[in-house]
């Protein structure tokens, strides 16, 4: 009898070992032609970087000082227009090439994969984080789905199910790391990022999925799929900061709340711009942002490049929330990683080097807009004042924003 029990135990162990999948074997099962265009594979239990790796390196390694705009480190980093020649590994090399088409404004992407079954019909992806659930329809025969625009330092769950049978094709969970929630909407809405995630001087954090900044959002660069991604992200409002020559008259995505104050330039001129009715245009922007956040609608604001006017408003909003000024200058310089038409305008021909065949980003923290706007708010703060107090003084005494609105904005945006 004891011998029989031993045999049964051994057989059970053999069967169990055969059923247990080796991770390498499991990954190899999802290689081949069907997956050759997929992003790197995401597996249950993985910890992955959400922020683009080049942007993450910059944000992690660089520390600036308040009230000192004489230096910048941005040109030391691969992934933007700096006219430095790099080899194929991103290492400076005289035999390399300058960056021709920066892509680091796009966040990291990963693929969820499953066994192909063309007979089972269409599928649905459900991707869930603590504050947002997204669903995406997938066509029959699909065997993977790429996911991107992930929020850093967040736990996710995912499930892919067949619509007809309810059978689960793939499911699991993963977590993310990183410093910045970047967003990219097809087919070419660039230079986008969430204002969430930044830490304040008093130890709080700006909430995610509330306010987004980016480059132009218009029909020419937002496809049908991109419009669906914008809605899925929780964005319900669009603020166009452009001037008379290119400002929109209605939202790019049907159903979005819309505001367009008509602003011709960024910097201090923008902060003191008054409309025909005698209303400060920056107050119009702040009022619309506050209304959107109050109503639970993510708001995406942009100019053309998402650099000067957009950068001015970002310094104001994050500065008001208490993000340190030295961190604001890092946030401002992230636009360096965006492509031509976003980090640099094609009309700025003086920044093109014909000999090297490369552009040069020039709107770093040492130059206009940032080196003009930051001192402006510091001067308003006065001796011993904080940057946030300077922004608050501007809003109450220059722009005409009620103190109650400022307090409400902080309460809604910080955790």
Would you name each region that the model predicts?
Residues 15-18:
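C-terminal motif of bacterial Sec signal peptides marking the signal peptidase cleavage site
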Residues 2-10:
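Sec-dependent signal peptide recognition
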